[in-house]
Amino acid sequence: MRKTKIVCTIGPASESEEMLEKLIKAGMNVARLNFSHGDQAEHKARIDTIRKVSKRLGKTVAILLDTKGPEIRTHNMKDGLIELEKGSEVTVSMTEVEGTPEKFSVTYENLINDVEEGSYILLDDGLIELQVKSIDKANGEVLCDVLNTGELKNKKGVNLPGVKVSLPGITDKDADDINFGISEGVDFIAASFVRRPSDVLDIRKLLEAKQNKNISIIPKIENQEGIDNIKEILEVSDGLMVARGDMGVEIPPESVPMVQKDLIRQCNKLGKPVITATQMLDSMQRNPRATRAEASDVANAIYDGTDAVMLSGETAAGQYPEEAVKTMRNIAVSAEAAQDYKKLLSDRTKLVETSLVNAIGVSVAHTALNLNVKAIVAATESGSTARTISKYRPQSDIIAVTPNAETARQCALVWGIFPVVKEGRKTTDALLNNAVATAVETERVQNGDLIIITAGVPTGEKGTTNMMKLHLVGDELAKGQGIGRSSVVGKTLVVKDASELEGKDLSESIIVTSSVDETLVPYIENAIGLITEENGITSPSAIIGLEKGIPTVVGVENATSEIQSDVLITVDANQGKIFEGYANVL
């Protein structure tokens, strides 16, 4: 199972039912709606289509609303474009004017109070660089030197690297879009241009005003101020997006890789999901294959510890949206296969602080590694059980069984979790049986697999994860008293006396009989297992099993009548149990 989650931006290239079905089948876990483009009616139609297709496919797909944020842009230029020449001077006005090579204006009138002489102003993703020469507050104008030649078009982005701006945390448009998202039941809000904790709390207040506790807030870190305040921001957030686009303009590009690693590490420490975004497979907007550098970029983000990787223009407006998702999926699977999960668990155990909450998670992860369990099945109301286990990055699949669709969608962003919605159970036994049955239904486990079940007891209460149980999936045919500590898999041979065994090849047979006498001993020596109805550690069956080192189970009631010949079974002498088919016993 792929563990790294894939976030896809939905736009004109991917909004159709046909293409959304392809993206979901290719591996999309979260659909991102970019509210910097389009109106609410367009996004409403996309939300409806995403839900329709995901329901039809029986797949869990979460929806992430990405706000436009308090960005700064230029106003319009004369004839739509002006050219700024290196070495010339240009005035940036706080009052809207039609842009010329001598003067243009910006949408943020308080810029004049935030910059100082020597500050840099970057235009159009940093393609044009200006340096503040003088400030005329009386006339609301900032005179700048043009440091490189370039064309400036309408409504281009403006960045102020190293400048603490006094922009609001969210704009009126953001608030309106967030309220729209609440009414539509989106799962995540990605907050653009977050600089300080108060920016996140402004959104939290909007959610609380609507009594909404289900939507998670994912701040996007895109500037130096956000980087500087990251610890405080994470304290009030539910996750993080490493938005490398504007970040690479606001800080030196060579600093981005190390900042990415640090931001991911801090999220890993707290067990909060982190998305790595921007230009991951950028060339696939135009080409059907990714570059080698892009493949390395995606893989290294996974090695850094990201929960999810994101596609932007590749799926929103690119020519090859399906191919981009498949490429992302294949890179993730390949990178995950190369992970040293033993070292990863050791590193995570040191990184994540010890607490009662984390105790069950680390115990489950260590047990899963040591016993090579097939899957970890977490019965969870809120998703916290599965998320706690995910912190430790177990190699085993994490199957989160929850009665809440909202919880399942929240888990869609978290590394390694495969969420399944299933009606809850009131008793512990029913809870465990339901968890096992659901795991089998996913086809990620099958009869004979060893799994770990974890849950909270009593059932139905949030935050009570306190139980871990090893469970062998499969039908238990019978049980008795085990002789020895080994196990064996083979075909049954039910016999009444030694005459039935003459001339038979017993090298792969498990003999099933009522009792053992001296005529059977020579044949038992050539068999690989023994099951008998006679009781006791001192019975002939037990003695021959011990002497010959053959996995043996004695005291199995009605063994000769209830077990058929030529049936593949597993004899677990350690537990005294007999399973149908192959079972991965300890």
Curated annotation (Swiss-Prot):
The record marks 220 as: Transition state stabilizer. ATP binds at residues 34-37, 73, 156. Pathway: Carbohydrate degradation; glycolysis; pyruvate from D-glyceraldehyde 3-phosphate: step 5/5. One of its GO terms (molecular function) is kinase activity. Mg(2+) binds at residues 222, 246. Its EC number is 2.7.1.40. It catalyses: pyruvate + ATP = phosphoenolpyruvate + ADP + H(+). Its cofactor is Mg(2+); K(+). K(+) binds at residues 34, 36, 66-67. The keyword Cytoplasm does not apply. Keywords: ATP-binding, Glycolysis, Kinase, Magnesium, Metal-binding, Nucleotide-binding, Potassium, Pyruvate, Transferase. Substrate binds at residues 32, 245-246, 278. It is an enzyme of class 2 (transferase). PANTHER family: PYRUVATE KINASE. NCBIfam families: PRK05826.1 (NF004491), PRK06354.1 (NF004978), pyruv_kin (TIGR01064). Belongs to the pyruvate kinase family. In the C-terminal section; belongs to the PEP-utilizing enzyme family. This is Pyruvate kinase. It comes from Staphylococcus saprophyticus subsp. saprophyticus (strain ATCC 15305 / DSM 20229 / NCIMB 8711 / NCTC 7292 / S-41). The gene is pyk.
